[in-house]
Amino acid sequence: MPRRGAPPKREIPPDPVYGSVLVQQLINKVMKDGKKSKAEKIVYNALSMVEERTGDNPVTVLSQALDNIKPRLEVRSRRVGGATYQVPVEVPPRRANTLALRWLVNFARARREKTMGHRLAGEILDAKDNIGASIRKKEETHRMAEANRAFAHYRW
């Protein structure tokens, strides 16, 4: 563990097209092996498809989808006297955002559409409508927290 405390959180600059930090975070999540320009093409393609299908501002649709995906509770392992308990804890806002983006991208990759742009657009639209794999993941996380509610007093 570092003796100097936690390093400062880096500020993420907004993306050049939409001027949104959220879109930039999505681009960074989609990026593989440092290929940012490829990730940008995929995300901008997906957002233009979202705009085409909904007729709304794609950034508001994306933020709405992420709000639907963000978990409020999760379980963390806590060891107490030789036994490991799954303790439900509230998710901090920054982590909720990160988890939502991670789930969105991972489940988009698992879809069967032809291109990653189509997959990402489909997953964003599904999440906006409260359906899809990323929403199921959030509900599963909440179910786990609810099932282990008895261990909530072990919270730290």
From Swiss-Prot:
Molecular function terms from GO: rRNA binding; structural constituent of ribosome; tRNA binding
Keyword tRNA-binding: yes
Annotated keywords: Ribonucleoprotein, Ribosomal protein, RNA-binding, rRNA-binding, tRNA-binding
InterPro entries assigned: Ribosomal_uS7 (IPR000235), Ribosomal_uS7_bac/org-type (IPR005717), Ribosomal_uS7_CS (IPR020606), Ribosomal_uS7_dom (IPR023798), Ribosomal_uS7_dom_sf (IPR036823)
Keyword Thylakoid in annotation: no
GO biological process, one term: translation
Coiled-coil stretches: none
Organism domain of life: Bacteria
CDD domains: uS7_Bacteria
GO-annotated cellular components: small ribosomal subunit
Signal sequence residues: none
Pfam families tied to this protein: Ribosomal_S7 (PF00177)
Subunit organization: Part of the 30S ribosomal subunit. Contacts proteins S9 and S11.
Function noted in UniProt: One of the primary rRNA binding proteins, it binds directly to 16S rRNA where it nucleates assembly of the head domain of the 30S subunit. Is located at the subunit interface close to the decoding center, probably blocks exit of the E-site tRNA.
Family: Belongs to the universal ribosomal protein uS7 family.
Protein name, as recorded: Small ribosomal subunit protein uS7
